[in-house]
Amino acid sequence: MDVGYEQFLAPELFFNPEILNPEYTTPLANLVDQTIMHCPVDTRRGLYSNIVVAGGSTKFKGFDKRLQRDLNRLVKSRYEANIKAVKEKLAGNVEVQGKQMEVCVNGSKKREIASWLGGSYVASQVYVDRMD
């Protein structure tokens, strides 16, 4: 079997889902970003700096780097927009400084079974009731 561009199409669906279906228009990076932005403000920096990818589909070559790059673009864009808005509000008379979020995406070598390992660990803990 000869596989051409199709080999690149599968992982691209995570980043451009509209390729498969026009109804799916939110890329994975945007979903991760939206999820973190719904968390309490004081936890966001820690969440952005410790994003862990799991599952067999994340083993595509460059997946974690691509996700990190796309998230960095979103975070940087929002940071610059916020700085600009603050400067405009203060009439540009004040130097505005802020610390941009650090985005770090990691994946273990055994990420295809990481979800199972995590679930198995939690289930083995004494405090987990069988009815939970």
Predicted ranges, named:
Residues 1-132:
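C-terminal region/appendage detector
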